[in-house]
Curated annotation (Swiss-Prot):
Family note: Belongs to the D-glutamate cyclase family.
One Pfam match: D-Glu_cyclase
HAMAP family, alphabetized: Hydro_lyase
EC category: lyase
UniProt protein name: Putative hydro-lyase SACE_1553
Its EC number(s): 4.2.1.-
Origin superkingdom: Bacteria
GO molecular function: lyase activity
PANTHER family reported for this sequence: D-GLUTAMATE CYCLASE, MITOCHONDRIAL
Keyword Nucleotide-binding assigned: no
InterPro entries listed in its UniProt record: D-Glu_cyclase, Putative_hydro-lyase, UPF0317
Keyword Lyase recorded: yes
Organism annotation: Saccharopolyspora erythraea (strain ATCC 11635 / DSM 40517 / JCM 4748 / NBRC 13426 / NCIMB 8594 / NRRL 2338)
Gene3D superfamilies (alphabetical): PSTPO5379-like, PSTPO5379-like domain
Length: 254
């Protein structure tokens, strides 16, 4: 499915996680903040490039971006709306909530490298089950910037022990979409008490012989919004991404 076709389906009301959609095309996290907070967030992202790799930034009020020819208000499957850091609703369309002062940031997403993992024979459990990737707040703090601060959020994929090195090698070639894992193995080292109870997304089975592998996650900006409490923000619903018009290969390094 092309990015344009996927966006049209979401605009028409399809609400599903986008992992596995539009293979070969880059997916992105969305965070839209008032212009007054835009510099603080841009600096936050610059200081935390592993979790917040910025792919594109709009002018205030713009509803499309150079890598996203659709409408940022309607063409993602689901959005989260925050007021003073509190999640107030999850909706499929934010047209009525959009403001002329909103600056939108498209942040790299690890869904982008999943096609490369599958091609190399590395299983991706949430794609196998048709679910959402599990995501967790961690005990690692991001570097603060201005009024923005918050914890690192990670996504987790179980990987057979014999293929962990392959997964690291493949994903390290995609630094603009989180790159190599930030942690391999014991969840408790990240402050994760129950691997079966993710903070975002859905749990997946870790089978015998598999190791949990954790990548920095673009839900980190929303965790920063919850902690920093700007007056208003809009983000994608975790796992329900912006499918861009950029190719995965554009973010692949040798």
């Amino acid at each position: 499915m092309s990015p344009a076709a996927a966006r049209a389906a979401f605009r028409a009301g399809l609400r599903v996680p986008t992992s596995g959609y539009s293979a070969g095309w880059t997916q992105a996290n969305l965070i839209a903040l008032p212009r007054d907070y835009a510099y603080d967030f841009l600096l936050f992202a610059q200081r935390n490039p592993k979790s917040c790799p910025v792919l594109d930034v709009t002018e205030p009020g713009e509803t499309s971006a150079s890598i996203f020819a659709g409408d940022l208000r309607t063409d993602l499957p689901a959005y989260r709306v925050y007021r003073d850091g509190e999640l107030v609703e999850e909706v499929g369309d934010v047209t009525g909530l959009w403001r002329d002062d909103l600056v939108s940031f498209l942040v790299g997403c690890s869904f982008t490298f999943e096609a490369a993992l599958l091609e190399a024979g590395v299983p991706v459990r949430h794609i196998e089950t048709g679910g959402n990737v599990p995501m967790y707040r961690t005990n690692r703090d991001c570097r603060p910037a201005g009024r923005m601060s918050g914890p690192l959020v990670v996504s987790m994929r179980p990987v057979p022990a014999s293929m962990v090195a392959t997964a690291v090698r493949i994903t390290s070639r995609y630094p603009a979409v989180h790159g190599a894992p930030v942690h391999i193995g014991e969840p408790a080292d990240l402050g994760i008490g129950d691997i079966d109870s993710p903070d975002f997304g859905e749990p997946v089975e870790i089978r015998p012989g598999e190791i949990p592998v954790f990548w920095a996650c673009g839900v980190t900006p929303q965790a920063a919004v919850m902690q920093s409490r700007p007056p208003f923000a809009i983000g994608h619903a975790p796992g329900h991404m912006a499918i861009t018009d950029a190719r995965d290969s554009e973010f692949l390094v040798p």
